[in-house]
Curated annotation (Swiss-Prot):
Species assigned in the record: Psychrobacter cryohalolentis (strain ATCC BAA-1226 / DSM 17306 / VKM B-2378 / K5)
Cofactor: how bound: Binds 1 zinc ion per subunit.
Cofactor dependency: Zn(2+)
Signal sequence range: none
UniProt similarity note: Belongs to the metallo-dependent hydrolases superfamily. Adenosine and AMP deaminases family. Adenine deaminase type 2 subfamily.
Binding locations of substrate: 276
Described function: Catalyzes the hydrolytic deamination of adenine to hypoxanthine. Plays an important role in the purine salvage pathway and in nitrogen catabolism.
Record keywords, A-Z: Hydrolase, Metal-binding, Nucleotide metabolism, Zinc
KW Metal-binding (keyword) present: yes
Protein name per its UniProtKB record: Adenine deaminase
Enzyme class: hydrolase
GO terms for biological process, alphabetical: adenine catabolic process; hypoxanthine salvage; nucleotide metabolic process
Length: 332
């Protein structure tokens, strides 16, 4: 099974680029930019990656992002992730970034997007890896601030395929952002949102019905509503599930309790992703390995999960078919 996982070409649809900031790069950038970080060494950082819920993770995640200042910093951050893609056979990736995390510190929107974009262009040139960029609004901030961020994104419409919604879920429902999502849709952006990770399944209904999204990030709480499960199945609405993240943030106590196999068996359109891999102990292959070792997943399940990620991506139908053919070739 592990050999199959490593062999298969994959797409990743739920990856926060700031969440791929490894401690080594964090220290290097902190030193270069003369930013104080509350850790004495790399081991100290790894020990701090011991989370009890989404918020305890976010506190550390935002502190880590402080070291990202220049365009080159965002290039290096993205490039290090691309090297992991090469290692894990990811041939298409759709990357989230959180502009508000950076603009709040005085780093310009242009600095962030240009650094990321340059690295992705090099990834295409050197490794043939295709990519899309999705800009996320921070849901703990106001809709008004989200509108400001949307305005900043407009000059970069050609570089950003969609908008999403992330950060602290509890108490920040999708309904808080109806108008800005409506405007984003009018501007031609594709729409996704984190929903049903920690908060209950009502947030998934809101994301579908009020924000009109075309992909749900996480969505594991959907299992608590038979009606919602049936709807997700009927619509083949993609769910970008992140197993390591769910365990690290205590959404499930352990991998054996994870519901990904149940969701898949029900007929939902499920994909596997790494979310914030530097913080959650593993990139995409490790997520696949962890679930395959702890759940009764078959080789066909793994192939389905991989194919779902291409089918649910924002690339052209022609490219999807090319990639699905490559999966079939790898299966042999």
């Amino acid at each position: 099974m592990i050999d199959l996982i490593k062999r298969l070409p994959k797409a990743e649809l739920h990856l926060h680029i700031e969440g791929s900031l490894e401690p080594e790069l964090m220290f290097r950038l902190a030193k270069k930019n003369q930013i104080e970080i509350p850790y004495k060494d790399i081991e100290d950082v790894r020990n701090a990656y011991n989370f009890t819920n989404l918020q305890t993770f976010l506190d550390i995640y935002y502190a880590g992002a402080n070291v990202l200042i220049t365009q080159d910093d965002f290039y290096d951050l993205t490039w290090e992730y691309i090297l992991k893609c090469v290692e894990d056979n990811v041939i298409h990736t759709e990357i989230f970034f959180d502009p508000q995390t950076h603009t709040a510190r005085g780093v310009t929107f242009e600095t962030v997007i240009t650094g990321i974009k340059r690295a992705l262009a090099d990834a295409k040139a050197q490794y043939g890896i295709t990519s899309c960029i999705i800009m996320c609004f921070l849901r703990h901030l106001s809709q008004e601030e989200a509108f400001e961020t949307l305005e900043q994104a407009l000059p970069f419409k050609d570089d950003i395929i969609g908008v999403g919604l992330d950060s602290s879920e509890l108490g920040n429902p999708p309904s808080k952002f109806i108008e800005v999502f409506k405007k984003a849709k009018e501007e031609g952006f594709k729409l996704v949102a984190h929903a049903g990770e920690e908060a209950d399944f009502s947030y998934i209904y809101e994301a579908l019905d009020l924000l009109d999204i075309s992909r749900i990030d996480h969505g594991v709480q959907s299992i608590k509503s038979a009606e919602l499960m049936q709807r997700l199945k009927d619509e083949q609405m993609p769910l970008t599930v992140c197993p390591n993240s769910n365990i690290e943030l205590r959404v499930f106590n352990n991998y054996k309790e994870h519901n990904i196999k149940e969701l898949l068996d029900y007929g939902l359109n499920i994909t596997v992703n790494s979310d914030d891999p530097a913080y959650f102990k593993g990139y995409i292959n490790q997520n696949f390995i962890n679930i395959s070792e702890n759940l009764p997943l078959t080789e066909d399940d793994i192939i389905t999960l991989v194919k779902n990620s291409f089918r649910s991506s924002f690339i052209s139908d022609e490219l999807k078919q090319q990639y699905l053919n490559r999966v079939d070739q790898a299966v042999g």
